[in-house]
């Protein structure tokens, strides 16, 4: 079935400029099925295979086609209305649905359909876009945004006001990825397909894009687009080539030690679903 979906999407995407004129019912049903599979976590925009993250470009294309062929509709909430092409994930959920999926979502948490939230996750007032994947026992804290197709691992804490970049606008080749057991400090921004590898700690106010220098002060090495596993990262700067000014960078200062782990330890009480 997946291969059939993939073939339909690849063929349709090549002629996406003409899709609005006459939408093939098969394509429409295929897109709906793909969004539902994303919503349930059955498929993902990116997967780690043999230690390497692989982006399923056809799934990303499916989301773009969705925006192309579906019209805006009125989405009615108890206190506010919306006008969009994509429904909210919890729109038709009742008490039993939340208990079954073991998700805690507080008021003003906006989660678009087509994103997946694993069990024992806590969603504070925040925004999670279509195609995103949130692993088990993770927290998305207040006023954070998880961009389209971003991948968040297990036991991850995304602190208040954090921005995790999406891939749909501006169009990016690969999604931003936060691997398992990471902590992202308040008001930090991780964008443009950057990968934060497992066990890393990003301090408050760190801004990392694809072209941001990531200076490993332990090994005197420069990285781009990737935070090596088990790194503690703080904001900093490095001198320009002409030494006339400094350029923003991220600095790896150490590996997480006992004190670091104590400070960022997740509170299991907050993830109880009873």
From Swiss-Prot:
Catalytic activity entry: (S)-2,3,4,5-tetrahydrodipicolinate + succinyl-CoA + H2O = (S)-2-succinylamino-6-oxoheptanedioate + CoA
Alphabetic keyword roster: Acyltransferase, Amino-acid biosynthesis, Cytoplasm, Diaminopimelate biosynthesis, Lysine biosynthesis, Repeat, Transferase
Keyword Glycoprotein annotated: no
Residues of the signal peptide: none
Residues that hold substrate according to the record: 104, 141
EC number: 2.3.1.117
GO CC, any one term: cytoplasm
Gene3D superfamilies xref list: Hexapeptide repeat proteins, Tetrahydrodipicolinate-N-succinyltransferase, N-terminal domain
Pathway per the UniProt entry: Amino-acid biosynthesis; L-lysine biosynthesis via DAP pathway; LL-2,6-diaminopimelate from (S)-tetrahydrodipicolinate (succinylase route): step 1/3
Localization per Swiss-Prot or TrEMBL: Cytoplasm
One GO biological process term: lysine biosynthetic process via diaminopimelate
Gene Ontology molecular functions: 2,3,4,5-tetrahydropyridine-2,6-dicarboxylate N-succinyltransferase activity
Taxonomic superkingdom: Bacteria
Coiled coil residues, start to end: none
Main location: cytoplasm
HAMAP family documented for this protein: DapD
Subunit field text: Homotrimer.
Family: Belongs to the transferase hexapeptide repeat family.
UniProt protein name: 2,3,4,5-tetrahydropyridine-2,6-dicarboxylate N-succinyltransferase
Organism for this UniProt entry: Wigglesworthia glossinidia brevipalpis
Chain's gene name: dapD
